[in-house]
Amino acid sequence: MATKEQNLEFLNNALSTMNQLATNPSTPKNIRKNIGDLIEGLKAGEYSVSVRALNTISSLDDMTQDPNLPSYVRTSLWQAVSTLENIRE
């Protein structure tokens, strides 16, 4: 089980990866908007870190299924998912 500090480190790493995609002008506009919404959801303190991470993982997984998604974006999204999967409470 990860400690609270480790969970926050994983969360910050995932947020960094997602923020890079959200601010990259070569990322499709609809993906940037969706990622921006997910970032806000991760930062909101309404639910526990693990619940926020699981909700984000689900949404990111749905986004990676889009066949029109550029491969570099898909790879970065998988990286964020992999980081978020390490969060445990």
Residue positions per predicted region:
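Peripheral, non-catalytic segments of secretory and membrane proteins
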Residues: M1-E89
